[in-house]
Amino acid sequence: MDNEETLGMAFGTLVGEFMRTKEVPELDAYRFAAMASATGVDGTSADLSTAAATIAAIDAATVAMDDNEVPYEGRILFVSPTIYGLIKGGVTRMVMNGDKNVNYNVNMYNDMRVITVPQARFNSAITLYDGTSNFGYAVPAGSYKINFMVVHPSAVLPVVKHEIPRIFSPAVNQDADAWKFQLRLYHDMFVLKNKVKGIYCHKKSTANV
């Protein structure tokens, strides 16, 4: 294996790690903020600290969606790690696998797939940096942490128009005598006005500072 092949493998690892630690968190944060801030989205604000209150709040969200005739099949329940822990404490179940290990994970709740979202990505608004001095995003004061969100996929349209990773050799890189990695991504998240009731957002009652 020559140096270029070895370098190619290294850049492959770099791209995967960059997407996992930089691209995906920013995409998640942007999309959840776009859904939470869309006009007409149902929801409420409250601090959930018990399993009973959490289960009741999620059940109230499903009732609101039922009243708005949102399709029952296909709903997804996105939750913060804290809320996921409360759900696990409020649901009675025990699954034994072939190794006799006990699994208390909750993958489905009332036919909704449960997906845990790190709290840093789960806010009602974010500020994107322009890349000139800082990269990524920040959570602005006045926004709210999201406890959970119920989403029907028909209510949203995530779009990735252009995504391309590029590698520049030292002979091409004009910034330094070094290899350079660049990722260009053009994307957006659209909430359909006639399907907006397919989103329910439950936020904390105290704003971020």
Q: What is each residue range found by the language model?
A:
Residues M1-D42, D47, D66-P81, R166, ...:
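Long, contiguous amphipathic alpha-helices that act as assembly "spine/axial" helices in icosahedral shell
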Residues T6, S49, G90-V209:
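Sequence/fold signature of self-assembling virion shell proteins
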Residues T39-M108:
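Extended, solvent-exposed, turn-rich assembly/linker loops in the middle of proteins
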